[in-house]
Regions:
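N-terminal low-complexity, Pro/Thr/Ser-rich intrinsically disordered segments
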Residues: 25-53, 401-408
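Extracellular ligand-binding interfaces
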Residues: 402-483, 489-515, 520-527
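Sec-dependent N-terminal signal peptides
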Residues: 1-5
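Extracellular glycoside hydrolase catalytic/binding regions
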Residues: 77-78, 82, 86, 103, ...
Length: 528
């Protein structure tokens, strides 16, 4: 788990305060599209939410961040919000995204570690979630609020797709959604609820139920029945709380949020076929959700995979009476080129939009300390998706890290502690080195740039003796890629430095600004 020393943000009011009803406007375009269908409450139907919500983005690795083995106060919202290396969320970040052309923010939230033994959500956590939701709504965007890593592959995840686990956790799950629904019951139609994220069976199988191990028809049927039971419980509880929740648009996910794509196993389609539309007291206010992460090393194959996904969703899910949102999408390639990423993003957005489906990107366009500035850490990717959605003539406002004059104050607290300079897999076909600039020469022998090679245990060290050090990657030692680059401190006492600039150097000599963050044993503070 990573930590950042970040500026404090007020946590909001107590549970006794009146819930604020944000006075928000429609996202771009500022008025609903012609033909928007409203019910007696004056609320959009689900199909029209898809039309009006625009392009979406996930506030990922933030309120969803968790570690079931971590012993820490569940009410300490700032610790958990930043424990996966992200900055404290600010209103400025949401306004930047709105100004750029985004219309929806999905806010993933993990709840279980923030509940007491009786299933009551800590007031400090609920208030922080409420505050972040209001940041989104006040910026004029739609917001999707969910239950996130309470599901998933972790053995300690408490929401599991089996009827036995459903019966055991039903009261706690419904109690959680009752608390969420009561907190937000007077918020308007720009707020949507999502039932659960990627719920898996007792084997923690991705792709389809019982994929892990020999296929078990009985266990798989039980898992799909449980998914439908959780979905129905969610709808029933939210509607029962009254207020605006009577007509709120609600999202239910397939098993594992699987999208049914692929031909390598006949059971891949099962999560779509077995998904049911919950019964509801109102019509046309439910949506289905799936996720999509194609490998993009072969762009033609990725394009076909997206097209097949859309066909399957229309045939097996939309036909059941509700539209679809791709609640998470991105790519699963280990080290894709920027060219491939842009081509894939453009094609994905164009195909999904043409199919009248919604989409929320996961999540890299603004990442780490870039969110605190705020700025776009991947402006090329952001521009590609925005132009694919709004049209090639659309020119988004995309502030970048290199346009801001700031530095990073680092406090090393343990011997051998490290600051991330750049942590993604780095192809040595595209990059030749890294450069770091400090505000002064370090203490002799105290700092080294540490480069992690392709193979575990293979590392390249270069001692830093002046205020600037450029390191060329040694491919003969490191292999075809670099897994991580850090600035390591050898001192066994607290030691403070200021990083003025860190860049990756491309083969053509151009530089790519990096955002240093804590790896372990140190704090990093952004200084503007």
């Amino acid at each position: 788990i990573f930590s950042l020393l970040l500026s404090m943000v007020a946590c909001g009011s107590s549970n006794d305060d009146v819930v604020k009803v944000p006075d928000t406007e429609q996202p771009d375009p500022d008025t609903p599209q012609t033909g928007t269908d409203y019910d007696d409450l004056g609320w959009e139907h689900a199909e029209d939410v898809i039309k009006n919500m625009g392009l979406g983005w996930n506030l990922g690795n933030t309120l969803d961040a968790c570690d079931y083995n971590q012993i820490h106060d569940g009410g300490d919202w700032m610790f958990w919000e930043t424990c996966w290396g992200q900055s404290v969320t600010t209103p400025e970040l949401m306004h930047m995204l709105k100004q750029a052309g985004y219309g929806t923010i999905r806010v993933p939230v993990t709840w279980g570690i923030h509940m007491d033994a009786n299933g009551v959500v800590y007031s400090s956590w609920m208030n922080r979630v409420k505050q972040v939701v209001e940041y989104v709504l006040d910026a004029g965007m739609y917001c999707i609020l969910n239950v996130h890593h309470d599901t998933g592959a972790d053995e300690k995840a408490w929401l599991v797709a089996s009827m036995k686990e459903y019966e055991a956790q039903k009261a706690r799950y419904e109690g959680l959604w009752k608390q969420i629904a009561e907190t937000f019951k007077e918020y308007d139609h720009h707020l949507l609820f999502e039932s659960y994220n990627e719920m898996l069976d007792e084997r923690r199988s991705w792709c389809f139920s019982t994929f892990n191990g020999e296929y078990d028809e009985e266990m798989a049927a039980d898992a799909y029945a449980a998914i439908n039971s959780y979905a129905q419980s969610f709808v029933n509880v939210v509607r029962s709380t009254g207020g605006n929740n009577v007509g709120r648009n609600l999202i239910v996910n397939t098993y594992g949020a699987c999208n049914g794509t692929g031909t390598w196993n006949k059971h891949l389609i099962d999560p779509l076929v077995m998904m049911e539309l919950p019964e509801d007291v109102v019509e046309n206010h439910l949506l289905f959700e799936v996720h999509s992460y194609p490998n993009i090393d072969n762009l033609n194959a990725a394009r076909s995979e997206v097209a097949d996904m859309i066909l399957n969703l229309k045939k097996h899910v939309v036909a059941k009476g509700a539209p679809v949102i791709i609640g998470e999408w991105g790519n699963s390639s280990e080290n894709p080129s920027l060219e491939n990423k842009i081509a894939f993003i453009t094609d994905f957005v164009e195909q999904v939009k043409a199919a009248d489906m919604g989409m929320c990107y996961w999540m890299g366009i603004t990442n780490g300390i870039a969110r605190q500035v705020p700025a776009f850490s991947e402006p090329e990717c952001a521009k590609a998706m925005l132009q694919a959605f709004h049209g090639t003539d659309f020119q988004p406002e995309l502030p970048t890290m290199d346009a801001v004059n700031f530095s990073y104050a680092v406090t090393y607290q343990q011997q051998w502690s490290e600051v991330h300079l750049c942590s993604e897999n780095i192809s040595l076909d595209e990059y030749k080195g890294v450069k770091v600039e400090l505000d002064g020469a370090p203490e002799n022998g105290s700092l080294s740039i540490k480069v992690y090679g392709e193979t575990e245990g293979v590392e390249q060290y270069t001692s830093m003796t002046s205020d600037c050090l450029e390191v060329t990657f040694d491919s003969s030692k490191l292999g075809n890629k670099v897994r991580r680059v850090t600035l390591q401190c050898s001192l066994d006492t607290e030691y403070c430095i200021t990083i003025k600039r860190a860049v990756l150097i491309r083969k053509d000599g151009t530089e790519e600004i990096q955002c240093p963050t804590s790896f372990w044993g140190c704090d990093v503070l952004l200084q503007k």
